[in-house]
Amino acid sequence: MKYIFISGGVISGIGKGVTSASIGLLLQSAGYKVAPLKFENYLNIDAGTINPIEHGDPFLCEDGTEADMDIGSYEKVLNQDMGSDNFVTMGRIYQTVIERERRFEYNGEDVEAIPHITDEII
């Protein structure tokens, strides 16, 4: 398995999503299987409650995920359905870890960013 990371820090609207989708299409046409993933550092669970003036309109996936507009670009360019497996927010990661802590899955450990959050990301 090979990974390509495209990062833009805090710069928004410069075409990272379209560039990523285009690179994916080139790889697909060369016979590679492509699975785009988008990770957002905001603490919202999904993009559905973010002010569209601030972040753009959310893209509604077939599975009900309210994702970033880039997920729509991935769907259109790559001709693949995207969903919750393709769009992850830091809020969703924290939510998963907190739910596990509430179910006592950490056996009473102190739940911390390292290692619990980082393990969830990996």
Where do the language-model regions lie?
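Flexible phosphate-sensing "switch/lid" loops adjacent to ATP/NTP-binding sites
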Residues: 1-122
